[in-house]
Amino acid sequence: MSLAVEALDHLVMNVKDVETAAAWYERVLGMKRVVTEPRPGAKVTSMHFGRQKINLRPIAATQREWFTGEQVAAGSDDLCFLTKAAPQAVADHLRASGVEVIEGPTDKRGAMGTIVSVYCRDPDGSLIEISSYK
């Protein structure tokens, strides 16, 4: 048997403050916040977009409370999101939202060809790349 994965369903981001992170991803990137309680007293905040989601895990959570990778650090992620919006419109939106544009628009290499990317950081310092294919 050979195995070939086909898509990313979700990922977990370790954050200092779930509310601050969720509000930023809602306001800046237009994601939908969904809060669930998989077991009594254990709330999980997820940010939904397209067919994916990001679970926001508080860095203070223990492995028993929320099983995750061995190294837990907020602000260590580097994520690229795709959009159909024009790159300059993305940069303008970020600035209008009070978010500093670190770089871009600039051409980069994406998984399926050339993308035009705009870079910023989320409240924890993770690098956020917002891109569109040429």
What annotation goes with each model-predicted range?
Residues 13-61:
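Core segments of cupin and vicinal oxygen chelate
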Residues 43, 75, 114:
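Exposed loop/turn and edge beta-strand positions of beta-sandwich/beta-sheet ligand-binding modules
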Residues 20, 86-91:
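Short, conserved charged micro-motifs
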Residues 2-4, 46, 91-134:
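Vicinal oxygen chelate
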Residues 62-67, 103-104:
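A short, acidic/glycine-rich surface segment
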Residues 1-20, 77-79, 133-134:
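N-terminal beta-strand motif that seeds the catalytic metal site of vicinal oxygen chelate
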